[in-house]
Amino acid sequence: MSGSQTLVVKLGTSVLTGGSRRLNRAHIVELVRQCAQQHAKGHRIVIVTFGAIAAGREHLGYPELPATIASKQLLAAVGQSRLIQLWEQLFSIYGIHIGQMLLTRADLEDRERFLNARDTMNALLDNRIVPVINENDAVATAEIKVGDNDNLSALAAILASADKLLLLTDQAGLYTADPRNNPEAELIREVHGIDDVLRGMAGDSVSGLGTGGMATKLQAADVACRAGIDVVIAAGSQVGVIADVIDGTPVGTRFHSLETPLENRKRWIFGAPPAGEITVDDGAVFAIMERGSSLLPKGIRSVKGDFSRGEVIRIRNLNGRDLAHGVSRYNSDALRMLAGHHSQQISEILGYEYGPVAVHRDDMIVS
């Protein structure tokens, strides 16, 4: 593909360590070399790196990964500076400056903070600086749980208005079955839409060092593809993998983006981590899915979590299936009071009103 491209490369702990308990510096050196090669050709490279906990564990000599959040945050605090120092040293060999962006998912929940992060990303890229994005594991808690690494990578790709997102992992891509247990498993080369059948094929990482599995990579691919970003899942050990993705050479599993991507605001809605969730009845499901309607309080059965007006929430049916993400017009306490009631009763129940709908269709993305 001709012309400059923006590529986000996500490097999980299993890739950075090679499955061991220590950072695999030789492997990291090779990945930096590949990134520098593409940077020299005029492409814009963004690194999303994890492994702060692994780096801290190596430095302090912890034989086992601790179970408590506080202990993991201790390791992250020690390892974060060592990890970014390593990236800086390696990129400086090629005369490339890096800029660290420490994020938590909370930084992306708020629309204004999201835009500020996007402006910072663009400023770095415009000045030929490679953004190196880390989770702020030393202060965050949700980020240490399974799945956030891959989903944060998709959000980083949205921030960068990337052309492609490369998720490097310890497998060659998405298989029809777990290749570790099934010798007949086949690599899926092309994906044009993520459905339940595809999700059923996803297995989990067994490295014990990272927090992401193949299922969460599918979630990240879904978010990025809806935003108009192609996604490739490939092995971090694949020779020349970064050049292959830039050039369009078949490698790993490629997820094709939507031909009509979401507009910028809806990219944020779909990508933002939900602050809570609501369960709706079958009537509301029909109205949302078949009629393209807004969600009214009458259709709400239950509310989970504590969230404010204007935050993104998840909408689910009675079976727990995700239907949509949307911006709530009311806070969680208000929606609990309004659940099952007609819109005409809102003022009577609350003493105020922000309109007749709980989530407006214009502020909703159907899954």
UniProtKB/Swiss-Prot annotation:
It comes from the Bacteria. Its main location: cytoplasm. It is an enzyme of class 2 (transferase). Keywords: Amino-acid biosynthesis, ATP-binding, Cytoplasm, Kinase, Nucleotide-binding, Proline biosynthesis, Transferase. The keyword Nucleotide-binding applies. Residues 275-353 form the PUA domain. Catalyzes the transfer of a phosphate group to glutamate to form L-glutamate 5-phosphate. This is Glutamate 5-kinase. It comes from Yersinia pestis bv. Antiqua (strain Antiqua).
